[in-house]
Amino acid sequence: MNLLLNYELFLAKAITFLFIIFITPFIFNIIKRKRTDQKKFKIILLEEKYKNIKKDILLSKMNKLEKKKWIKEEKKKDKEFEKKNKNNIVTLKKKTLFVLDFKGGIHAHEVIGLREEISAILLAANKDDEVLLRLESSGGVIHGYGLAAAQLERLRQNKIRLIISIDKIAASGGYMMACVADYIISAPFAIIGSIGVVGQLPNFNKLLKKCNIDVELHTAGDYKRTLTMFGQNTELTRKKFCQELNLTHEIFKKFIKKMRPCLDIENISNGEHWFGTIAFKKNLVDEINTSDNILMSKMKEKYTLLNIQYIYKNKKLENFTSFIIENIKIIIIKIFSYKKIL
């Protein structure tokens, strides 16, 4: 008996200790995050990054005497350039290419950063500046990707040229974003298209009946709930659900046709996807290339290359918990979701 009591006391102490070690810091992080603004912009001057890479490679090929001579010559060139352009505002006259990255998940949560990045660009951009968005997304919920596409439209409305580069995939909702661009670039084997809508969910009604479990589902309005996981689905509700899918598909098609009038929309909106080279022949993209080549060519054209990133200053614990929670949510959504997925 004493042994059992001692064990229970030990167990209580162990649980208390684990709570203090793991849960308390997490609670403090949440409180701190509420009190302080954890968001900020990170701006990277890409041409400096490439120049430093070039410098490191060149120096690695030289012996000590060559390195010394090369560094001396470079310093001399820099001094001459500074002296020559001392009274000239050269940088303000140069065109700027703002580089953004969007790697979208099923809910397009990344639009939180995209909207801030676009707002920042609109505040600072000149009329000849351009935006390059490196896009990677296989699509997701319509309201998420609809908002992402609407954010990109802000650039078109302000007459700022938008280039979208697809190195891997821009399918479904991803292509909804891509079609907003003035110019679309795709890698040869990138996946493009999938202009369709899907909605699915399991129904456990028969299983629950076998277990003698009743489900109460009451709605005000005939179509407040169409398909349900636990209630009994009828032909009427199934028909309504399919109507909603078709309506969403029609809106999707109209949006793409508006953004890219050159497309034969009925031919390419059957849900099929293609590799970049085939998508080019179907006018889904304008050029076969990679984002890296675009950056190099713009650098040769003397553009200032600015990579704009809106980031959160999350702690490692927050990153880890967010990663676990997000992946669990994605698995559950893929199994049970009835939302309209682009």
Swiss-Prot record:
Keywords: Cell membrane, Hydrolase, Membrane, Protease, Serine protease, Transmembrane, Transmembrane helix. GO terms for cellular component: plasma membrane. The active site is at 172 (nucleophile), 224 (proton donor/acceptor). Coiled coil: none annotated. It is found in: Cell membrane. Its main location: membrane. One of its GO terms (biological process) is proteolysis. NCBIfam families: PRK11778.1. Possible protease. This is Probable protease SohB. It comes from Buchnera aphidicola subsp. Schizaphis graminum (strain Sg).
